[in-house]
Amino acid sequence: MAWFLCMCVFSVVGLGLLLLQVKLRRSLETRGGPPSLPVFPLIGSLLSLRSNQAPHVLFQKLQQKYGHTYSLMMGPHTVILVNHHQHAKEVLLKKGKIFAGRPRTVTTDLLTRDGKDIAFADYGATWRFHRKTVHGALCMFGEGSASIEKIICREALSLCDTLRESGSASLDLSPELTRAVTNVVCSLCFSSSYCRGDPEFEAMLQFSQGIVDTVAKDSLVDIFPWLQVFPNADLRLLKQCVSIRDKLLQKKYEEHKSDYSDHEQRDLLDALLRAKRSAENNNTAEITMETVGLSEDHLLMTVGDIFGAGVETTSTVLKWAIAYLIHHPQVQQRIQEELDSVVGGDRTPQLSDRGSLPYLEATIREVLRIRPVAPLLIPHVAQTDTSIGKFTVRKGARIIINLWSLHHDEKEWKNPEMFDPGRFLNEEGTGLCIPSPSYLPFGAGVRVCLGEALAKMEIFLFLSWILQRLTMTVSPGQPLPSLEGKFGVVLQPVKYKVNATPRAGWEKSHLQTS
């Protein structure tokens, strides 16, 4: 009986505290905070988020009632949704460092060994050092590097040959694109690549998809961490996938350690090893293991970050691009005519051709607009009390930029659901333009995508090589690829099959990489 009375007292007190918290949260709006969705004890605004629509679409729809910027409660957490480019740029650019924090969640902590990576790590000295180190390595081996262009072209040739050899059979494009992009990133990170059917590559595909599927579910355990004491199939699967990934990363790490040389940097992992050794051997106050945090965990998670993000995002953009080209054969034909005119059939496309292929570049930009690979950017956290526009924002509030809303704003884009590469061309159709400031496909500011330049290189070269040699269609009587998308860590197209028909003169692969 006494136990029951104690439970009742604790329940009443707890409920009272929660009601007080809700009252205080609601009062934020009257003190200058953004308009808020309804808030209830314990669950916050979750009842308002029940919908069959994907989150980015629902958040876009809710702005009709609450305005471009509004707030909600995810359990005990204040979340502010930003759906307009002016406020988005204030968060990302004008006040980038103030909003550079990251929230801690159960799933991302499992994925990153408690935030020891770049994408999900909180802002601070350790994060800045890691990002600077990785950016330097990417500049050395990636952006503008002739060696990385050669690697991409090698994989583009292999991909085109695989597609050509499929003959009249329909082919699932997803694993082939993923392997091609994986090999580019593996060459950059590990100086290695994979052949079709390689067991290690197949394991990589499996754990990557498992991570994407589980992290994407916005599990209740991330809102209420105490739920992890109960059996959870998603968490169990995530742990299994992370374990497989970590074994692969550890294997690559040990291989690099065994033959590492200070006189040669072969790849990104070598660059990180050099930075780690410098930190271990440097006794100055400016650089120590404590200040930069370059432990083995940090090193492995940083590489894992680049590997995971670099493969999933770029391959997804390529899948969307080909899906839209199948839907719009006139766009595909115009790109091919542009390639024929500028590149011809006696050589392969090169990065130096980008400025001379405006319609292809415009098409890539339109794909990134209409189907942003990350429709909701990774949440930011306010590190101090601040503001967004006229709205007060309290320290610790989570900010989500709805890139989907920015890219589908009817006031910024004419017929935003229409696929129209021409919107990115000047009036003469001879040069590129950005017709609206509401366009941020790679984010912006302090947390801008590290691999933006590399991704643009890959997308351009893979598409130009494919379209120079092949025409992409579906078999007669087969449905066109769905353009709805599957929401997750990235917005993936539903799997589809293609027919890759060699263009005239390209029945055999007569041009190789130089």
From Swiss-Prot:
Its cofactor is heme. This is Steroid 17-alpha-hydroxylase/17,20 lyase. InterPro entries: Cyt_P450, Cyt_P450_CS, Cyt_P450_E_grp-I, Cyt_P450_sf. GO terms for biological process: hormone biosynthetic process; progesterone metabolic process; steroid biosynthetic process. Conversion of pregnenolone and progesterone to their 17-alpha-hydroxylated products and subsequently to dehydroepiandrosterone (DHEA) and androstenedione. Catalyzes both the 17-alpha-hydroxylation and the 17,20-lyase reaction. Its EC number is 1.14.14.19, 1.14.14.32. The gene is cyp17a1. The keyword Hydrolase does not apply. It comes from the Eukaryota. GO terms for cellular component: membrane. It catalyses: a C21-steroid + reduced [NADPH--hemoprotein reductase] + O2 = a 17alpha-hydroxy-C21-steroid + oxidized [NADPH--hemoprotein reductase] + H2O + H(+); 17alpha-hydroxyprogesterone + reduced [NADPH--hemoprotein reductase] + O2 = androst-4-ene-3,17-dione + acetate + oxidized [NADPH--hemoprotein reductase] + H2O + 2 H(+); 17alpha-hydroxypregnenolone + reduced [NADPH--hemoprotein reductase] + O2 = 3beta-hydroxyandrost-5-en-17-one + acetate + oxidized [NADPH--hemoprotein reductase] + H2O + 2 H(+). GO terms for molecular function: heme binding; iron ion binding; lyase activity; steroid 17-alpha-monooxygenase activity.
